């Protein structure tokens, strides 16, 4: 097992060279941004047959195969990245329009279809005049950067007996905390949600991570699918009712206009009392399984919590997130073995929600996330590491960005273009009291210390 870890250490060795000299000037200057982005809106990864096993009622039909980026997902990404370029322009990193200078963008995507197509949509929105290209892993099998355990780069996560008990306790607490949402899912879908659940810890040589099976896994997956449906067919979903304002104050005129369109009477969706004689009625709503956006957001914490518990768990995060975090850090420092990434003002990795959860778990980063559950990663979410230079040195800062819910729940191009991105500034571990950032060398050292974790397993 140790030889696997030594392969990963080779990636981390790129952090060791001396960090270049500090920049001149008093005002901090944004020198570089490294982004880890989730792919855009996709269809469920489950097959129609798998979805049919969850409920006797039909599900809406998608016009792409399971797990593929949809046309609407690509559209949302284009608008999101058009806005993001304007934000970077305001910060002085890149020009607001025109063809990008050669070498200013390094875009690397996981090789599967939904991430590659997401990268294409990102380019179309960010630099429609050209000036960028998409890079992917050329070898056989899965990309070791995004799938280090499955590809064999890193060993399977090994959980101690205490860590296993802790995970089970967290899942039990989740079931108590989200009892109302789980009951709602049970009434929507039927007995599949009520099946017992179990955690499966990987054996050495299986190239797997920790997995959840059973009713709680079904509930978690279904909660995500219901949200994806709302984002794919927002008009249809909003016809079911629900208020999606999320309690935000000081809305812009364009956001107020959006919410006037989206607001509707209280949901016509009500859950009958569950009884022993009739634990799961065949129908709660007529027609395909679908809920309003408000209901979807109330159910989503089931999925977000399961994701957090499994993917942020230390052994899982180390095995699955350490190589990617090491590469991102080395690019910030300008010491990676990829000269194009070192020289680029903006580096973007297009991966998956699990990648963001793994890296955020290693850095102990958390976000409130507005209308969405805390720490959740809606389609297109971005975990951003930025490098700021001043006469006092180089500082790394972190933030979380995503498209606004108002943009996700409209088909109006004006709204999608004009509603600002949702942003949260995050606090890095060991950060100073101002701005939540860390000196670059201290941040690199902190990442290096993470290598001690799997070496002890």
PLM regions and their residue ranges:
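Positively charged n-region of N-terminal signal peptides that target proteins for export
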Residues: 1-3
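Short, solvent-exposed loop/turn segments at the edges of secondary structure
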Residues: 5-8, 378-380
